[in-house]
């Protein structure tokens, strides 16, 4: 039998209280540190495609973003919920997909369209965070920022800087006009191209160096404001949200950034001569019409392709330098050890791929986005320089950030928390993600395939492993029918609608309740411009066609009425 003996030890009063103090410190200090919620710096970048160093672009000079990628997680298969500013940002900041929110275009005002939705920054405020915001976060400028979103909002949303929107008006730039800034005179448009996006009031499809102080550019002003808040923050935890305007057009930047990319060194995207030949009718329209930017043929005609590529990369490098300034300030304020950094772009941007400029398409150049999550430097349990290949979506931001902060997630949010991936605990991850580029039109992206399904029932299918530039549409191959049908299972039902119909150049939506809506399909994404009242004869014929034929398919084209 084991014998247990009592041992008595005499301890001096000084030693006793010293040991007691050590016990109190050892018990309480780590717990107190663990109880301090982390800060989050939330960085959005407008119109940034995957032309960054950490995603493999050979010319992009982005040392600060690359350094962030080396300290955290870079998601190499991240896609946007919508390839246009308004619906993508609405999805991120509401946690709701375009199909759920009904926001498919840039005609968005939260107070009018989503008055009951608690936005992501407001959710953090409601859960004990001090929330600061500056720059382009919500679409539509400072007037569209919900009052409850931030404790303090600094404004500064305006992509025209250093010029004003008035100075970029089409009527003033036909063919050009002179603007004086900082004692210097500029001839606009800088690229010498005429505006061919006629419906837009401002001629922003322009680029080139602007030799003015950084302080005249809104992104520089936004970063300076954000850094100033770090000086004044009295309470943690905080969420600091910073929205950059560049590389949104016009691609105007301080001259030194353009000097980084000589025109004779510009590497242009590969655009085969007959690249559009295997596309459906709707896709060709989407490629060629200058909805969000100008025409490819205009860029080529005026010899501006190299200049545009150089200016886009200059914009990216300008933003990168500003990000570096913010990170340096976090380090100087000794906040870096308890601050997560989340960096994302609202969607991609074409620079001639598919003969298209701008965004708003279903191709990967519009849907793929840079996305970084960088844990605090003091948290060693997370890996560094981890390239994550799982399919993820910007809708995943809201639940992920809630998990990072240790606050409740809204049951209405539709994304998936990425915390299991960050902790290497993700099992059975669904490797497919959805991008919606208009009512009834969607892209499904997987590691191997990208399916683009249009409202009229036409499709594109690309093998992203063997054809990453999407040169060969495989949708018409009979052996791919099963794959297409399998991918279409990820497309939402959109139960509000009975039919999506294309007739000539009209897009027709037939709801289960209410009146038929008719749109000019060339401007398909502008779903606020219903012209049904202007074409009553067409509406009558469509109703007659449906009554007579009782279509079984939800999406189809009518050739003759």
Where does each model-flagged region fall?
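Formylglycine-dependent sulfatase
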Residues: 2, 10, 27-454, 458-459, ...
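Long, charge-rich, low-complexity alpha-helical segments
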Residues: 548-556
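Short hydrophobic beta-strand that contains or immediately precedes a catalytic carboxylate
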Residues: 461-462, 518-519
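Short beta-strand micro-motifs enriched in acidic
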Residues: 452-454, 509-513
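Bacterial N-terminal signal peptides
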Residues: 12-23
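Terminal low-complexity segments of carbohydrate-biosynthetic enzymes
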Residues: 316, 520-521
